Amino acid sequence: MMKDKNIGDVNFIDRNVLTAVLREAERRGLEVRFILMGGSLSEGLASSASDIDLVVVHDGERKSNNIVMIVEGVKVEATVFGQQDFSRIIGMGRQGAAGAAYFWQLDARRRLLFSRPIHGHDAYEAQFRQARLDDFVADLAEFQKSLAIKSFSDVKGAFDDALHEDDLRIRCRIHLEHSVDLLLSSLGDYYFREKYRMARIRRSLKGDCLALVEDSISALLSGRMPAGGGSTSLSAWSGQVFAYSSLCQYLAAFSDFWSGWLTVGDVERFLQKPVLESPVGIFLFDKDVLCQSRRAAFKIPTAFANAMALTLLGFSEVRVAEGIEAYARYESARGRDEVVPGNLLQRKLEEIMVKLGV
């Protein structure tokens, strides 16, 4: 493994690695359409234990061997696809396979969809943006259905028909594992995780956003409370599980699969206990969507506030109304009653719901 370079050093990849790969592709006569950082077949399936894994997609249909090279002491491997082969893998669905092949297909598709383009971004986005959204929503819906959770804001609904406590704890852990997986995928974190450690939650949670939740999530997955405090009763523990699950899904849904829209401070404020226990309101704020609780707020571009994701995440009309009312009280306490006058609250809510399509 490389000693002096950080695989998360995007500048090094953009400046040195990308240049070398493009030069080699040109030498082979390949017209490169786009290049992804960390890709579907790179982990565990690459032919060598490389330090940096890329996927190169070219406009031709002929096969080409992988690109393997050393760049400033760093081992780089790029899996090369023709456009037709790449599209075929992206087109794989949840049907027609069973057992290990089923999971391989989904994993290959997902990692290709959620890898970060470092070259040809516009071409990649134009072709696969909707597929990424569809894949994310399908995953979210499937897990919501399998766990019989009415919404992510209604934890109690999962426990009304009481099962054995051990079974409920297992279901909660699976739910949190999936939420973490969604967030890792959305941040392109397949690239940063430990190589060849295929167990989903044994990967290393790296990056600014994930570093803040790594210890807490690890504790919850081990059946403990974050920071070693509080009761480990099912109700207390599951409440934290669903709080962190909702956070991971929320960040994944609205980051547009990029971490750049959220700062470490945003996540840190969101993770404060009073914030986790308060409903989050979502409403328009100028050209952005403002996400507001009593203790934290951050803005998201409206293009990323997908109506279906809002619904699946449990942001019903009631929750949006609660958020607006909480925001109005918050501003009123600061002497800014004019921000959301009470008599405009219902009209504002209706406008928001129409614009968000909920």
Model-derived features: positions:
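Long, charge-rich, low-complexity alpha-helical segments
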Residues: 297-358
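Catalytic metal-binding acidic patch
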Residues: 35-81
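Helical scaffold of the NTase/Pol beta-like nucleotidyltransferase catalytic core
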Residues: 1-33, 358
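Conserved NTP/Mg2+-binding pocket subregion across the NTase superfamily
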Residues: 2-6, 16, 67, 74-166
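Short aromatic-enriched loop/helix-cap "lid" or pocket-rim segments at secondary-structure transitions
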Residues: 48-49, 90-92, 194-197
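Conserved nucleotidyltransferase catalytic core and NTase-mimicking acidic/glycine-rich helix/loop elements
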Residues: 138-286, 291-296, 302-304, 308-312, ...
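Ordered hydrophobic segments in well-structured contexts
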Residues: 33-37, 55-57, 288-290, 297-299
